[in-house]
């Protein structure tokens, strides 16, 4: 039998959105900051030769240039102030989380609650600045070597570094503001908007190739069907759960004895969400971004890296799949579903898994179940991310589209819709509480005894 909360969620009407003032304010706040982000992608970095840059990006559109342009919302192709995008922040998050699982001092900070979380976030910001400085300097030098700068020199490099680092830090601040005062995860929404903004241009280019005969009609229809099938598959897998039965014993409160209750612990097939795909993509882009922009000026090492780890190459696909599997397990067991904490919480609440002792045995059982579930989850992520890469390379499609982009778009949309529904449900609860309080006051007023009139003398 469904609970009251589940019944309210099922009967939730989107018409209540007009009455939820706070939710509407959060939505408008989020849209406003995302518009600011999109405007910033069109503000160019000073000193760049726009014509040469456009020619270069057109040539690189089907490879690494298309990937970088997709993840930066086209800012890199226009060399805007947000050309580095949010990737330095994501890379810094990877490094800090890896160190937190290996360095005892950082591991202790994770256990200190809100104070420790703020300290770790501060370290992540410092790492973001350091990585952004490194990437911006390398990009400035690469732009000079690629003959994309009007006046090469120290002043050009300094202006590029200051502009790009400032743009990345501003994006990080935008993401934090959206998370705190808007709807959804700010960092994910920024990446989502950047991807969606590039879709119309790529779609128009794809259809134009079909009209010109460069791509056959069956290929166009096949790609459309494949994208629709992948989207449906992603939605299905993101909602898939492995339920573990939880039993709570009978308890006595005062003179009353309450029967034992049963519930379930939901374990998603993909507990890590879109994070492994973003982590893997950011690490793959890090070593090849600089070498791509340096053109023919690259050394033998960078040329070899670009040749073997370019999009569609066997080593690129193998490395991509391996990183997705690694980050799926790492992020799940260290961040999104820590079996030690879950087992401890169950023990403190008096819950237990039938046939399993609370404590260490429960933790071992949860680790066993999650490890097996993640075999399916990591394989699903690798399949979704690699399938479009292989098909695009085999069919020679002249622009980039990837499973990572589809995964990010679908996951962010589902997460944002869930958050909107949660706010609407909370607003509906508040309305019910206010009505019950008003009825209580009216009931007290109606049942009050009338005052007696003074007796006549």
Where are these regions (language model features)?
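N-terminal cationic and glycine-rich segments that engage phosphates or anionic surfaces
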Residues: 1-110, 115-457
């Amino acid at each position: 039998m469904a609970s009251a909360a589940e019944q309210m969620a099922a009967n939730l009407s989107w018409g209540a959105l007009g009455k939820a003032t706070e939710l509407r304010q959060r939505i408008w706040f989020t849209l406003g900051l995302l518009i600011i982000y999109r405007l910033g992608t069109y503000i160019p970095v000073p000193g760049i030769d726009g014509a040469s840059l456009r020619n270069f990006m057109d040539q690189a559109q089907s490879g690494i240039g298309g990937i970088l342009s997709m993840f930066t919302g086209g800012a890199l192709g226009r060399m805007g102030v947000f050309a580095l995008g949010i990737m330095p922040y994501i890379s810094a998050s990877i490094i800090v989380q890896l160190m937190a699982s290996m360095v005892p001092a950082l591991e202790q900070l994770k256990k200190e609650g809100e104070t420790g979380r703020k300290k770790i976030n501060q370290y992540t910001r410092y790492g973001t600045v350091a990585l952004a400085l490194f990437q911006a300097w390398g990009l400035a030098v690469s732009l000079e070597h690629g003959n994309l700068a009007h006046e090469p020199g120290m002043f050009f490099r300094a202006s590029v570094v200051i502009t790009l680092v400032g743009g990345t830090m501003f994006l990080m601040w935008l993401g934090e503001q959206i998370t705190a005062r808007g709807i959804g995860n700010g960092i994910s929404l920024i990446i989502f908007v950047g991807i969606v903004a590039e879709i119309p241009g790529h779609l128009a280019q794809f259809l134009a190739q079909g009209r010109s005969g460069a791509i056959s009609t069956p290929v166009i229809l096949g790609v459309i069907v494949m994208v629709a099938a992948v989207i449906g598959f992603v939605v299905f897998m993101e909602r898939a759960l492995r339920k573990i039965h939880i039993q709570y014993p009978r308890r006595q409160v005062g003179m009353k004895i309450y029967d034992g209750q049963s519930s379930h612990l939901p374990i998603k097939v993909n507990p890590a969400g879109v994070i492994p795909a973003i982590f893997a993509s950011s690490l793959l882009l890090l070593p090849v971004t600089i070498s791509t922009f340096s053109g023919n000026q690259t050394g033998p090492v960078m040329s070899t890296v670009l040749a073997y780890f370019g999009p569609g190459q066997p080593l690129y696909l193998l490395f991509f799949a391996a990183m997705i599997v690694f980050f799926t397990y790492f992020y799940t067991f260290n961040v999104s579903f820590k079996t030690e904490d879950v087992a401890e919480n169950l023990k403190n609440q008096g819950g237990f898994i039938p046939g399993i002792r609370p404590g260490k045995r429960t933790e071992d059982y949860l680790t066993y179940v999650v490890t097996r579930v993640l075999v399916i989850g990591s394989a699903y992520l690798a399949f979704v991310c690699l399938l479009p890469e292989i098909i695009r390379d085999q069919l020679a499609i002249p622009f980039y589209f990837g499973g990572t982009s589809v995964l990010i778009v679908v996951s962010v949309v589902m997460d944002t819709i869930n958050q909107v529904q949660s706010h609407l449900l909370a607003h509906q609860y508040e309305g019910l509480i206010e009505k019950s309080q008003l009825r209580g006051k009216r009931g007290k007023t109606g049942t009050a005894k009338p005052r007696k009139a003074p007796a006549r003398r």
